C-alpha cells in the first residue's frame, strides 16, 4: 500500500474473483474502498491478439502454457491464476483448451504440456496486428486411463496465504491440464488459523474427482494426511513449537487410528528430506514417531514423492518397512499451494493407481491401500512379475521369475533399477529414447 501525496488516500492492489489484480484506494478516514478501473493499457508498442487452441491426440484438451515474447518477457492472459514455477522460474498458466492473449507484434515462443502423458511442445508463432490464431497438437506417449491407471495428487493446498482466494472450481482445469484424475487438497492450519473447514463436504460432478482431506501436524512427531473421510480430526496441531495446544500430549497413532476407524487412509507426508537418512548425521531427519507407528501397523500410506523431500531417501526408508514384512502403501503429493504466485505445478509428484472397476473415490482408495500403484515425478512405470501386476502376490518357490517393465516418460531418465529386499538386483542405463520396454 502507498499513501498519495496529500496523505488522505491509501492506494493498494487486491485480487478479485477472476484472479485479476485491481488497483483500489480507501480514505485514511475510513469508508468503502474504491476500485480504480484501468481504461487503457499503454504497451509502448503495437500489439496483436493470439487465440490459442490446444488438442491432445486430436481432441480439445486442457494444457499448461508458458509463453514469452522476443525479449523473454512472459505473455499471460487477462484473467486467471498466473504462477512462476519455483525450480526454473518459468511463468505459466492453464488453458481449458482455448485461450486468448495479447502481446507485442513479433515472435512469441509457446511451450505446452499435458501432465506426464505427453512430451512438451515448443512452437514459435509470429504475431501481427489484429487477430492471430494457432492450434497446438500434442500426442500422448501413454494413455494411462485407457489401460486402467489413474493419476492422483494426494497432498496439496487450495489456499495458504497467497495473493488469490481460490474456490475448488478454480483448479479443475489445472488438474485436467496436468492429467490428474483425482485430487485431495488438504485443509490445514496457518499458524493458529484453521483454514477451509467448510470445504470438507465439497462434492463435484464428473472428472477430475476433487475431494478434501486433512493435514494433521505435530511438528515433533511428524505431519500426517487423512484422506477418504469428510470428518475432521481434532486437534489439527499439538506439541512443542506451537503457540496453541503446545502442551497437548498425544501420539500420532491417535489420528492414524481415527482415520482407520472412519474407513479412511492416513499416513506420513514429506517424511525424509535427505538422500541417505541412515547416516549418523542425518537419522534425525526421520519423523520421530514414524518408525514406531510403522512397526506397530498404524501407518496406512507413506508419501514417497513430495516436492519438499528426497524421493531416494524416503524410498530407502520405505524399503526397510517392506523388508520387515510390513505392508505400507505408497502415496504421493506435490504439497503445492495453489494460490501462490511462486509455486510448482500441481501433480508435479503423483501416484498412479489401478483400481478394480470404474474410477470412484472408494475404488481409488481400495486400489491405493492394496498397493496397486506406482509413484512418479515424470516416468510412468508398468511392471509385472510372472504376469502379476503391482499389488498382487507371486506364489513361487523358484529363484528366477519372468518380469516385464514398460516405461513411458516425457523426459529422459538416467537409469532403471529393480530392487529385491531393498537391494538393487538389476540395472541398466536409459538409451534410445524416453519410452522403452525391458524384460
Model-based region annotation:
Residues 10-13:
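Residue position within the beta-strands of beta-propeller blades
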